[in-house]
């Protein structure tokens, strides 16, 4: 994290974890956005908190976010027309132990349920299993399987993959 790097005297550009840190920053940002109207406030909040520090980083993130939200499917997801469950835990019991999973974004509209997990790195098949797991948990909660759709949104690759 930026604070730890600062204390250790590691420049942000030299940090071995800069790609991980960037992914976490973007994940935090996208989790804070409920509708498209929230983008500027969410970025401003991260600047205020010192998570986004450099003006060029701010400009890059604003541009990446604007571009990501230009995709029609994303515009629908962030339109405000959905009942939203953002970063909400799904809790269940397995072999006598409580377990939790936290999808990035679950949306409901009419009889449709959409699970979206956003990723800021390269495609990986393990992510498909992760979203399938979220979908199975929603089925166990009583939602009809045929009403549940899952997606992986590889933000920086401009790719939405149906699971």
Predicted regions located by residue number:
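Amphipathic alpha-helical interaction segments
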Residues: 35, 85, 135, 142, ...
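Basic, amphipathic alpha-helical patches used to engage nucleic acids or provide basic targeting signals
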Residues: 103, 109, 113-149
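Substrate-binding beta-hairpin/strand module that engages nucleic acids
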Residues: 143-163
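Nuclease catalytic cores
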Residues: 1-103, 107-112, 126-128, 153-157
């Amino acid at each position: 994290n930026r604070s730890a790097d600062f204390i250790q005297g590691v420049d942000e550009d030299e940090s071995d974890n800069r790609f991980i840190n960037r992914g976490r920053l973007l994940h935090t940002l996208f989790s804070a956005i409920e509708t498209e109207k929230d983008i500027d406030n969410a970025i401003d909040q991260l600047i205020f908190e010192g998570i986004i520090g450099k003006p060029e980083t701010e400009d890059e993130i604003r541009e990446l976010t604007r571009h990501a939200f230009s995709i029609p499917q994303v515009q629908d997801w962030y339109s405000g027309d959905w009942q939203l469950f953002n970063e909400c835990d799904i809790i269940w019991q397995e072999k006598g132990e409580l377990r939790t999973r936290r999808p990035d974004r679950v949306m409901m509209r009419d009889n449709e349920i959409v699970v979206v997990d956003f990723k800021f790195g390269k495609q990986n098949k393990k992510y498909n299993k992760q979203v399938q797991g979220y979908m199975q948990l929603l089925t166990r909660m009583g939602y009809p399987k045929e009403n549940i759709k899952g997606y992986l949104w590889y933000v920086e690759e401009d790719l939405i993959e149906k699971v």
